[in-house]
Each structure stands twice: as structure tokens, then as C-alpha cells.
Amino acid sequence: MKHRDTYILFLFLFNFCTYLWSQDSNGKTRRIEIVYGGEFTIDNVKYPGATIFKSDGQRVQFRHQGLDVWCDLAVLYEERNEVIAHGKVVLQQGDTLQMNSQYISYKGNTKTAVAREGVVLRNGNMTLETEELFFDRNKQEAY
């Protein structure tokens, strides 16, 4: 039991101090920062290889190169460089783009996101509502 607790503590600290894979403007490897994780668990049966972060009153938050995401539950796959966010998800890029939904899958390697369930995208004066939306940060396109 003691080794398990040590492993979980190490994993928790590791996730808060490191980043997932992605490319920055210099072509160097970068990682997604877990800003706040709340409660965390590991469930290798349901989410093999993932760390699960759950709100503890304060929302789970992660950040990647000018993109912030808040949610109630985040499933972090370090090997796949992917975060899946569930429950009242808010994606904010800079001060102009905001997307709300119930689910977002964000891939750091490709800087792409898929949002589902009650998606509302706001960019300046434009508002788009749909049930599914793909967002490519490299091209700054949503479709």
C-alpha cells in the first residue's frame, strides 16, 4: 500500500510539473501544463494508461500554448499526448475565442480539438451553436 501511495504522489507531482508532447514555434517538444487537478485517480481498467483528474470544488484546468481549458473531469493520456475533458467544459484561446461544451478531446501533438454536446463557439461578434465541432489551432479553423 505504501508503494502505491508513493507512486500516486509521484504521478500527481509529475503531472503538475511537466507537459504533454507538442511542438512550439521553435520546433522543440513542449508539454501541456496541468494547472489544477483537484482529486486524481488511476483506473487502468476503464482508462488504460491515463490519469483522471476530478474537480474538488475548483475546476480542473490545463493549459497549452495560449489555450486554457476548464472542466469537471479530465482524463490525461501522457503517452498519446491527449486530454479528454468532460462536464461543463470551457476552452479559452487568448481573449477572443471561447468554446463551451460537455466534452472536448484535445490532442497536443496536432493542436486539434473535437467538442461535442451543446457546443457554443464565440469569436468576437460571431456565435456558432452545434452538437459537434472540430477545431484546428494550427489553421485557426473550426468546422
Task: Please describe what each predicted stretch is.
Residues 21-143:
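N-terminal amphipathic/hydrophobic interface segments
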Residues 1-26:
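Bacterial Sec-dependent N-terminal signal peptides
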